[in-house]
Amino acid sequence: MYKRQVTPPATGISEEENLAGDGDIHKVYLTFEDGPSDHTGEILDILAQYDVKATFFVVGKEDEESQALYQRIADEGHTLGMHSYSNKYSQIYQSDEAFEEDFERLRDELYQVTGVNSIYYRFPGGSSNQISNVPMSDFIHYLNEQGVIYYDWNVSAGDAASNAYSSEEIVANVMDDVVKYKTSVVLLHDASDKSATVEALAPLIEALNEMGAEILPIDEDTSVIQYVKADSID
């Protein structure tokens, strides 16, 4: 059975506090959401080639291949986070009960498959989305009670908005913004229609290495990037 871990709400860093100055080390967190898919294994292969760890905010899948990918993510030292079970906004955000049921279904599945007590979550659409029928503060309060830290992003590859970006454009989108911040949480996708993201990954890692960035998985030492700060919710 999943073991609940209760921690105080995370304090999100402000954008002003996060602006990089001369001599600051850039910490970059590559985060992939919407998988696992047929691209996830390719992404894991590339990360292994460069000895880079990342974070995967996964959705719920019950097929054998997807569950093997959950296990591989954990076994290879990446952070296994949650992105909802269904990834269907109209269902997840319909009510408090619907959100909690979706969350618990994914959390419990990941624990049963991998033994990982995942404590990281990314809201579909982010914590400031305008899609939910229920105030997002309700869901944030629930995650706070569960001891779960949610992460938004402050750098986007652009692959969510369009599949038209080339791999070169995806790299440029990321590199244009990571130079601004001490901590960059990069939004990427490993859904089945994101082949350009896979093609962009190796040159992106090389560009980040060239600028001297540290590429890290989200963990307890990571500065929290949130649009709606968890500690602002009663």
Where are these regions (language model features)?
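Conserved small/polar residues in nucleotide/adenosyl-binding loops
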Residues: 1-5
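Catalytic domains of cell-wall/extracellular-matrix polysaccharide-remodeling enzymes
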Residues: 87-187, 191-209, 213-214, 220-221, ...
